[in-house]
Amino acid sequence: MNTLLDCFCGMGGVSDGFALEGFDVTGIDIVDAQVKLDYKHKFIQADMLMLKGEDFRGYDVIWGSPPCTDFSTASCPNKTRKGRKAPDPERGLELIRAFRKFVDDANPKFWLMENVPRTTKFYTMEKPILSFWIGKYAKRVLWGNVAFPLISEFRFSQVLEKDYQKFKWRKQSALKAKIPLACSRAFARACKQALEVK
């Protein structure tokens, strides 16, 4: 069975999609009450800054979705709510660098990292392999070593818009953190194809 390590797994949007495509999934996150309630797979509570990739060798795919709040325009200072930290790209880059070092040390067959487009203004060490929309309003960027043609075969705009509408985004703000299943399943299929080729 193919294996996925989902770093910064949150409530499991990516994990769920990969599991539905037959992957054995393990998630890692610092954790809060919402994650504990919603995450349905094997789980490791940990800070990515403290983990060593060497301890996680053997996974076929490692996925990372570092928090986007330090790069997102939705977190601009003029929109900052009381008690919420203002965006700090350097803080966000620390997590991205830690994830990339973790991946290099863990040496999976494939890795993918997802974040908001504005991240590319600050993280310039690698070029993204894909940018895509989740519905009409949320754009994302993907880095990794899965062959671009395998990913681009999927028609994200059609699949994602349908999936996006299923969520009650305004009523349950926590769902905003979830990557729609159609999206994560498409990436899981691309990874499965890549693993068959490798």
Predicted regions and their residues:
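SAM cofactor-binding core of SAM-dependent methyltransferases
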Residues: 4-52
